[in-house]
Regions:
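Active-site neighborhood of HAD-like aspartate-dependent phosphohydrolases
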Residues: 1-54
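C-terminal cap/substrate-recognition subdomain and adjoining C-terminal extension
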Residues: 2, 83-188
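A general boundary/transition motif marking the beginning of the first structured unit of a protein
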Residues: 12, 51-54, 71-78, 90, ...
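A structural signal for alpha-helix termini and helix-coil/disorder junctions
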Residues: 30-31, 49, 53, 69, ...
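Solvent-exposed, non-transmembrane amphipathic alpha-helical segments
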Residues: 33-36, 41-48, 63, 103, ...
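Short, compositionally biased "basic patch" segments
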Residues: 45-73, 123-126, 130-131
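Metal-dependent phosphoesterase signature
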Residues: 59-98
């Protein structure tokens, strides 16, 4: 399948100047400092994975549990109206960190390890309809899919077909090599 003109973009570090999930985390901790208790365990899982001391499955489990705890705590916080409102307020403040070179087209695909709950709002504001992200069930605050590492290419193929060819892929990371391999042109 050739997707003529298909443009796929990594989000954090590529379109967004920084790591949006980390920025949201710090932003939310300003509203409820209890959120700080979740950063060390998440970083520990990420470092172990990067050093080869944890499998993708272990990282998925650990990050999933910590994210669920963090989002549940925020959703119950008396200091936060709702997680959705917090995300909306976050983008009111941080939307300017979308890099000016990015000129969105409605059929672009944003591919990210960050959560649909957070990046979905940025996509809405950008006018981009296609988001492939880690997924959170907002009813339970459970992570239902972690779109990280090899999961990115796996999920992308599930959604767009096993033989899809990307015309242009934009990323800031060599960890996206499986996506780079699917593209006619890749830009870092």
């Amino acid at each position: 399948v050739e997707a003529e003109g298909m443009r796929v973009f990594d989000f954090d570090g590529t379109i967004y100047d920084g790591e949006s999930l980390f920025d949201l985390y710090l932003y939310s901790a300003r509203h409820d400092p209890k959120a700080f208790r979740y950063i060390a365990p998440v970083l520990r899982y990420a470092v172990k994975y990067k050093l080869g001391r944890a499998t993708l499955e272990q990282m998925e489990y650990g990050v999933g549990k910590m994210t669920e705890g963090y989002l549940t705590e925020l959703s119950r916080s008396k200091r936060v109206a709702s997680v959705e409102q917090l995300v909306d307020d976050f983008w009111d403040r941080y939307y300017a960190r979308i890099k000016p070179w990015y000129q969105p087209e409605s059929d672009d695909v944003i591919l990210t390890a960050s959560f649909d709950l957070t990046v979905g709002e940025a996509c809405r504001r950008l006018g981009v309809r296609n988001l492939v992200a880690s997924e959170v069930d907002v009813g339970t605050m459970k992570v239902t899919y972690l779109n990280f590492s090899t999961n990115k290419a796996k999920r992308f193929r599930e959604l767009y077909g096993p033989d899809v060819v990307i015309d242009e892929f934009y990323t800031d990371s060599k960890f996206d090599q499986p996506m780079i391999d699917m593209a006619r042109h890749a830009f870092m």
